[in-house]
Amino acid sequence: MLSSHGDNTGRVEAGEIEVVDFYGLPGEATLGDVEQKIRAAIDKERLRAWLQPHPWRVYRDLAFRWGTIGLAMFGAAHWQNWVAYLLAFFVIGFSQYGLFILGHDAIHYTLHLNRKVNDLLARWLIYGPLFMGLDDGRRNHLNHHRWVGTTNDPDRYLHSLADKNSRLKLFFFCTGLATFGKTVLKVSPFGKRQQHKTATEKLAPGNFKGYGLSQPLTEYFSQRISVFVMQILLIVSFLAIGLPWWSYLVLWIAPIYFCVFLPDEVRAFCDHAVDLVPDTAADPYRLVSFTPSWLEATVFSPHNINYHAEHHLFPAVPYYNLNQVHQDLRHNSHITVKRSYVGYLVQLFAKLPLPTVCSSYS
């Protein structure tokens, strides 16, 4: 099982994973087997407490993120110097990332109890401003939850160590350049068509036909009405408070890459990473969470997204209750808890390349 250094807390440092026995489960246990075992041990009263909604927290966090963005814009407009712009870049960028993580709850319908309100908030206050489509994101992410730890996971390229098993490859991945195209493509009409083709070929080889691009294109643009409207409103807002036209590119578009896409790709890797090659040997161990510092949480994991194992186990739990789930499961040795995203990456970088292991799960 995962080494816990005798403290029975399930907390392990990066790079200290041993493949010995697998949690005492029979046969070739999968990640799904582990998840099922953990869920079965949770009583209904505890689960009911975890699921308790507090909608005011959502409104508070949305207001905080947008209020912070507004203050940063006004600050840049008032001082109009490079220090103000640099500060606004990061304040706006990490506020955008906070919004993006709140949107993750909307994907699971846990942002608001009313599903229509849930999607309305997500489309107009989160996904539209960030150039994203809620339905495409939901389709991809729910498939990730369904297939995590298998070759069918649409996000597997993010978690895999097999294609990052050198210092150069890991560094290139951490720039975002290695995965940007794949991440954009999978929620595009072309990616949707390819996923449909792959699924069809698995069920009935040679029978892929009758699914062109017209339907995916129509769905793609209909989802992004909020994108077009919100970008116009944002441009008007930048100009109305006295910011130059290029500030929209520098203070809104650029941070989406550097403060949203890039940290989220790195976080997604770390939150599923296991120091084993090949990936099939690592798959049963992908219940990973982090307990980062406040600064690291701001950069990589706002709104409790660092409790990623807990989220995968109980995706219906709202983000603001995940710390409670973490406290209740902190002694579960099936969950690997790492302390620092940066610390993990540094230790992993020093260990690369990893040798291929022989495992009954590969």
List the predicted regions and their residue ranges:
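Histidine-centered catalytic micro-motifs
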Residues: 99-108, 137-149, 268-274, 301-317
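Transmembrane alpha-helical segments that form the membrane-embedded catalytic/substrate-channel core
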Residues: 91-103, 133-135, 181-186, 252-280
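Aspartate-rich (DDxxD/NDxxD/DxxxD) Mg2+/diphosphate-binding motifs
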Residues: 102-121, 149-159
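Active-site-flanking alpha-helical
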Residues: 72, 107, 111-112, 279, ...
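Cytosolic juxtamembrane regulatory segments of multi-pass membrane proteins
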Residues: 210-212, 285-304
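Membrane-cytosol interface motif
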Residues: 119, 123-127, 278-290
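Non-catalytic, topology-defining segments of multipass membrane proteins
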Residues: 1-93, 127-250, 319-362
